[in-house]
Amino acid sequence: MGIMLDETDKAILRDLQEDASISNLNLSKKIGLSPSACLARTKNLVEAGIIKKFTTIVDEKKLGIEVTALALINLSPLNRETIHSFLEDINKFPQVQECYTLTGSHDYMLKIVAKDMESYRNFIIDSLMQNPAISGVDTSIVMSTEKRTVSVPIDEM
């Protein structure tokens, strides 16, 4: 069960998810609080761990990153030691943007970005597959991104 939020907290979260660079003054005006009350509520949301961080979304294509891949990973043997080793390794690689533990026929799914297909291939062979616990990598290349959001649906809470 999640933390109970009132409508003001939800409004703060909605607005910050839309634009994390909004000033506290503008945010307070938008939601109808004094700046000090708005700042206190925002700090409470951070301290409660509801707001994990404030960040910027970058257009990777404009930086020359042309490949986004979803790699399904299998580990063998699948035990605490291999899982720990795998997670330590992938956290070292900036190309790995996301990692999910799965149920079903694959153990993990990674979202990996690379400059081009050659860079992706080199990353898989020279970096990722150096972990002996990885027994298989099944890759799908993203052709286009139709929806991308990091926002949580606040109104569904």
Curated annotation (Swiss-Prot):
GO biological process: response to amino acid
Superkingdom, natural source: Bacteria
Gene Ontology molecular function terms on file: sequence-specific DNA binding
Coiled-coil features, chain-numbered ranges: none
Gene3D superfamilies linked to this entry: 3.30.70.920, Winged helix-like DNA-binding domain superfamily/Winged helix DNA-binding domain
Matching InterPro entries: ArsR-like_HTH (IPR011991), AsnC-type_HTH_dom (IPR000485), Dimeric_a/b-barrel (IPR011008), Tscrpt_reg_AsnC-like (IPR019888), Tscrpt_reg_AsnC/Lrp_C (IPR019887), Tscrpt_reg_HTH_AsnC-type_CS (IPR019885), WH-like_DNA-bd_sf (IPR036388), WH_DNA-bd_sf (IPR036390)
Function description: Transcriptional repressor of the azlBCD operon involved in branched-chain amino acid transport.
Stated name of the protein: Transcriptional regulator AzlB
